Regions:
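An amphipathic, hydrophobic-aromatic interaction surface with interspersed Lys/Arg
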Residues: 1-165
Length: 165
């Protein structure tokens, strides 16, 4: 039974509220709220409240197939989003690793703070309202730029070694 419920498709509506086709329109803050929802007393109701503004009372009256379909949809979308962010993580040299660069991972607040500084926003909370796809694209661009600068620096270093010989 559980296998059948988990295989339910995304419903078009849940409790009369339209279900989006994907989660691309979410703000970064909403994604962060979803991450924190796992620690809620009722994570399922909290997830539905965050995304569709449906109360737990209304959710209890919903068709169980629709609820499971919605949850499966959200789970797959979050996997997709996490993979996108995972695919653009910066690579570090062994020297950077030895120096403790991984200790500079400040989680969600670090992303909010980085984007705020990047865009000249003085209040990090304002970044919570920015679409996650925008933050993702800026992060991807910055990481690509950083990787290019590392390669270029390495080329300059190699050229200097050749000239000194």
């Amino acid at each position: 039974l559980l296998e059948r419920l988990n295989a339910q498709p995304r419903p078009s509506f849940l409790c009369g509220v339209e279900v989006p086709k994907n989660l691309n329109a979410l703000s970064y803050g909403t994604l962060d709220d979803l991450r924190n929802a796992t620690a809620a007393e009722d994570p399922i109701s909290e997830c539905v409240r965050i995304l569709l503004d449906i109360s737990s009372v209304d959710l209890m009256n919903a068709d169980v197939n629709d609820v499971f379909g919605f949850l499966s949809f959200v789970k797959e979308e979050l996997k997709r989003i996490n993979k996108l962010f995972g695919d653009i993580k910066q690579t570090y040299s062994k020297e950077e690793e030895a120096a403790g660069v991984r200790d500079l991972d400040f989680g969600s607040f670090g992303v909010l703070d980085w984007y705020a500084r990047r865009m000249g926003i003085t209040n990090q909370n304002d970044v919570r309202d920015v679409a996650w796809v925008r933050i993702y694209q800026c992060m991807k661009n910055d990481n690509m730029q950083s990787e290019f600068e590392r390669r270029l620096h390495k080329q300059y270093m190699n050229n200097n070694k050749v000239r000194k010989r």
